Regions:
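Amphipathic alpha-helical polymerization modules
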Residues: 1-142, 146-262
Length: 262
């Protein structure tokens, strides 16, 4: 009975974590470039009542007798399927087609990665920044990309090349390029908030994509499917309720045992 109670507690903890992840997914259903999370479980250790025995000449083999001791959290994964693309007709809104991440530099000089392509001009110097003011960087992740404030016009090509006509006309400047980065294991990236990811020991080192595909005038939406999340929420809620029932039932049995002696 104590085993069943502890199994119920482990199940409740797991389904609470699942509900936490589902809640975060739903909260970010309209967040640009957001990638949803997924929770998986695995069983805990099993207590062995008796071991397995092989067959003999006079009797057959016997399978092991084991009692499971509950469930545990196996993983919280980030699902990197692409979100739908929303047209904005704004040239600094950039959507990545396929794999890849923009690289931005925070005030401390750290390189972070994002799929959210809503960029803006720094009015002071024409640098391209994200909503937090982090600089979009190009080749080598060192130099902030810049379009002079007095440029007559500009465009961003599908390969990331930035083209602009300087003030007063003249030759089109194409010296800057947005580089998309990729990882051998994107699932190993660490979320740091603000639609940003950080390289980790298990993500592999960022490498430059050879054939980047960028769509100017569009944004990648969240890949959260509300109908799927609501279904998972119902399943998690019922799972939580079922585990509470295990605890209350075990408690009732213990109460009966206590009442045997009056």
């Amino acid at each position: 009975m104590l085993r069943s109670m502890y199994s119920g507690i482990s199940g409740m903890k797991n389904f609470q974590t699942k509900l936490d992840v589902i809640g975060n997914n739903i909260a970010n259903v309209n967040t640009y470039g957001f990638k949803k999370g997924r929770v998986t479980f695995s069983d805990l250790y099993s207590q062995q009542i008796s071991g397995a025995t092989g067959a003999t000449g006079t009797r057959g083999g016997v399978n092991p007798r084991q009692v499971g001791l509950g469930a545990q959290l196996a993983s919280i994964d980030t699902i990197y399927t692409p979100g739908s693309t929303q047209s904005t007709a704004r040239p600094l809104d950039l959507a990545i087609t396929g794999d890849g991440y923009f690289q931005v530099k925070d005030p401390g000089g750290n390189i972070l990665f994002t799929r959210a392509g809503n960029f803006y001009f720094d009015e002071n110097n024409g640098d391209i920044v994200n909503s937090d003011g982090y600089h979009l960087v190009g080749t080598g992740g060192k130099t902030p990309l810049n379009i002079p404030a007095d440029a007559e016009s500009f465009s961003i090509g599908a390969d990331g090349t930035i083209s602009y006509i300087p003030a007063g006309g003249g030759t089109v400047n194409t010296s800057q390029k947005i580089e998309l980065m990729n990882f051998s294991n994107p699932g190993g990236l660490t979320k740091v908030g603000g639609n940003l990811f950080q390289e980790s020991d298990n993500s592999g080192t960022a490498t430059v994509m050879k054939n980047p595909k960028i769509q100017s005038g569009a944004l990648e939406m969240s890949n959260v499917d509300l109908s799927e999340e609501f279904t998972e929420m119902i399943v998690a809620q019922r799972g939580f309720q079922a585990n509470t029932k295990i605890i209350t039932t075990s408690d009732e049995i213990l109460q009966e045992l206590v009442n045997l002696k009056r």
